[in-house]
Amino acid sequence: KNKSCERGTKIHAEFENSMYQNPEKELKRYGLGGKFSVKKGHYRLDTEKAVYPEFLISVKSRDGVLRVAGQIDLLIKDGNDIIIIDFKTNKKIDRKSYYNKSTKRYECLKYPLNTIQDCNLMHYTLQLSMYAYLLQQINPDLNIKMLKLIHIDHSNKVEEIEVEYMKKEVEVLLKHYKKQLLIKEELSKDTPIVY
């Protein structure tokens, strides 16, 4: 497991370094042209054309109940268009979950996402969708142009997978989680006082 983590860290670092050396070359792959600034450690999306490696994002709900944070491997901003890229270095990307022969169904995530297959492709799709949703909470004018996984398997084969923006599912998940937090808080008020 340590070797896998080290490999993933090394691949992330190599890509990040290539961004600093020649961002224009790297961005042509995504149909983008022109000069882009590379903004390492800069967390305000105030530049018209910019690349943000390892972009930290944190959003608190208006009522203060929820705080969600994450780190986007690569965020590209072209005007209001946003591209989110995440690197995965695991052995494989599973596109289907385990098929249970006795129930004749694929395993799904827990409620409220219990219609979504429980496989790493869907986990990663939800992860990138959460990032996109959080960005739109910060600035509703942002347009999510693309969510992409770049998978580098253990034989160094690279596969780019464009994933769907599951905004509705993210909203359902956050609403459910917030409700659970509020219920837990209410129940904690009923605990007896010990003298």
List each language-model region with its residue ranges.
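Strongly charged, low-complexity linkers/loops
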Residues: 61-66, 92-99
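Conserved catalytic cores of phosphodiester-cleaving nucleases, focusing on short active-site segments
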Residues: 12, 70-96, 105-110, 131
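Metal-dependent nuclease catalytic cores that hydrolyze phosphodiester bonds in DNA/RNA
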Residues: 1-69
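Short, flexible/disordered intra-domain loops and linkers
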Residues: 95-103, 115-118
